[in-house]
Design a protein with these regions (language model features):
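Oxyanion-binding "anion nests"
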Residues: 217-229
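Outer-membrane beta-barrel strand-turn architecture
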Residues: 3, 45, 55-59, 103-105, ...
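N-terminal periplasmic/intermembrane-space "pro-region" immediately following the signal or transit peptide
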Residues: 1-28, 34
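Surface-exposed coil loops of outer-membrane beta-barrel proteins
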Residues: 22-43, 74-191, 200-207
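Beta-propeller domains
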Residues: 198, 206-210, 219-222
Length: 229
């Protein structure tokens, strides 16, 4: 029982109805290929059901884990973006699955290894702890930002206002499939200027070429949050 006492269980469910006033002849992809989750016109959908099991690592020396299990119509599109073939019948996805260790370095170096959601972008696919109240998403969310990475990351708080993160992953743009022998790198600097202003700078880069081909890609991203009250 002591083994399970610190494990938290979370979850949520989302359903939707989508309508296109242009009344396309073919409802599938009726809202344009440039959409992500809200493509199909005049359609009810169960978008996502999520179950999260997590053991946090708040103290130096703690070992934990996180597993996010998801089911719904959103996931064939997400899996395709991660380098797998689109399969509309495959509605299940392990969105995150990693082990954590709060290493005894300074005030604590947080290390995660496995599959985790990206640190890049203003719109993420994080579940209950990163809830997004809008159903439709921006162009950057679906056709630029990666969704997840498979690898290892380490984060460290230099102060209450400044933190840094480094990552080594299979692919710089989020694919779970490693199509070459190289590894991608990623980094983040997050600074809270005041109660109403925070700045986050993100980067990921590496070779995206298949096999022995060299095709380097770099992804730069900045997020500035401004509070108006």
């Amino acid at each position: 029982l002591l083994l399970f006492k610190d494990i938290e269980v979370h979850g949520f469910a989302s359903t939707s109805y989508n309508y296109n006033f242009e009344n396309p002849a073919t409802p599938t992809n009726g809202n344009s290929q440039n959409r992500v989750y809200d493509r199909d016109a005049n359609t009810f959908k169960f978008d996502n059901g999520e179950l999260v099991l997590v053991k946090e690592t708040p103290k130096v020396g703690d070992v934990g884990f996180r597993t996010d299990l998801n089911f719904g119509s959103n996931y064939p599109y997400m899996n395709a973006s991660n380098g797998t073939t689109m399969n509309l019948e495959n509605d299940f996805d392990v969105q995150q699955g990693y082990v954590s260790y709060n290493a005894p370095i300074g005030s604590g170096l947080q290390i995660d290894m496995g599959k985790f959601t990206t640190h890049i972008g203003a719109e993420l696919i994080d579940g209950h702890d990163g809830w997004n109240y809008n159903h439709s998403r921006s162009y950057l969310f679906g056709y630029a930002n990666p969704f997840v990475h498979s690898g290892v990351r380490a984060g460290y708080s230099l102060s209450d206002d400044l933190s840094v993160l480094g990552m080594v992953a299979n692919h710089p743009l989020g694919s779970e499939v490693d199509n070459n022998n190289g590894k991608a790198l990623g980094a983040q600097i997050a600074y809270t200027v005041s109660d109403n202003l925070s700045i986050v700078l993100n980067w990921a880069g590496g070779n995206t070429g298949a096999g022995n081909a060299v095709q380097h890609a770099n992804f730069w991203d900045s997020v500035i949050d401004i509070g108006l009250t």
